[in-house]
Regions:
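Domain-scale activation on soluble regions of proteins
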Residues: 1-299
């Protein structure tokens, strides 16, 4: 089905290539899904690292509480996306048939715990005395318990209309950073060597959400007044998208292009849903049904 799009600016096209563009971005996949997923995982992880270090360093020094709180959602999405991509890159190293790949991805979808279980099965690996193997299983299990479908950090509530943070929660950015780095390093090492690393890491509980830490190295979420509001999520993705855009333009970080696009795409979806639920004349119950029906669609 074709659509007659009305662009904000004239002569715009998603497929337009301007040879005179000051900041050209070239995207070329290798054709090998394992290699391509590995590269995308690296890009998303790098973007997440850039954001968390900015928050923990420059933003913390400026006592910019708003950024520390709001940017959490986009940052954790970038980290989670990197884990899903590196996990699937490992699976695609073993499974090379297109049919089998589709079947496995359809089975595990976005569930990191199921993906890890499948990877262990495919590689004939078992839980051993290796602390990293067991820690990672517990960590990914905790993520799946909270965010099985990769939705809970994108929207103020899930398809069941339940909120993730039903009370004010002070999340440690340091613990989040350390745990995400450990998980990513373990999966990257498995991809590179075929074995689980014996490296020792900073010890934190294998949990996605760990409270505590220095006040200006925390993200505080779950404010009651914004419990079901789209604003914090919309602002998070839009502002982090702008931040990554500036890094691309000013520091030539072209590898952040795809993560930036995801930030903007999510912001557009959230902005549209915000209008439907919070600013339209549609009765709230009907508006929520529209959201459930549309899922991730922006059309």
């Amino acid at each position: 089905m074709g659509y007659d799009f009305k662009w904000i600016q004239p002569n715009m096209s998603l497929y337009n290539v301007n040879p005179n563009c000051q900041y050209p971005i070239s995207i070329l996949n290798s054709g090998n899904l394992a290699i391509d997923f590995y590269k995308y995982a690296k890009d998303f992880f790098g973007a997440a690292e850039c954001v968390v270090h900015y928050l923990g360093e420059e933003v913390a020094v400026k006592y910019d509480i708003a950024k520390l709180d709001i940017w959490y959602f986009a940052m954790i999405y970038l980290y989670r996306q990197s884990l899903e991509l590196i996990l699937k890159a490992n699976i695609f190293q073993v499974v090379v048939s297109d049919g089998e790949r589709k079947e496995i991805i359809g089975e595990i979808r976005h569930d990191l715990k199921q993906g890890y279980d499948k990877l262990l099965e495919l590689k004939n690996l078992e839980f051993t005395e290796n602390n990293n193997t067991n820690w990672l299983w517990e960590f990914l299990t905790d993520i799946s318990r909270i965010d099985r479908e990769s939705d809970m950090f994108r929207y103020p509530f899930g398809n069941n209309l339940k909120v993730l943070f039903d009370k004010q929660t002070h999340i440690s950015l340091v613990a989040t950073h350390d745990n995400m780095n450990r998980a990513y390093d373990i999966l990257r090492g498995l991809y590179d060597t075929g074995n689980f690393s014996e490296q020792e890491y900073e010890i934190h509980l294998p949990q996605l959400i760990i409270e505590g830490g220095d006040y200006y190295q925390q993200s505080v979420v779950g404010y009651k007044y914004a419990e079901r509001s789209f604003y914090p999520y919309y602002s998070s993705y839009e502002e982090v998208g702008n931040f990554l855009r500036d890094k691309i333009l000013e520091d030539n970080k072209k590898e952040y292009f795809m993560p930036m696009c995801y930030m903007y795409r999510n912001a557009v979806e959230l902005g549209l849903k915000r209008i439907i639920v919070e600013s339209s004349h549609i009765e709230r119950a009907k508006a929520l049904k529209v959201l459930q029906k549309k899922k991730h669609s922006i059309l």
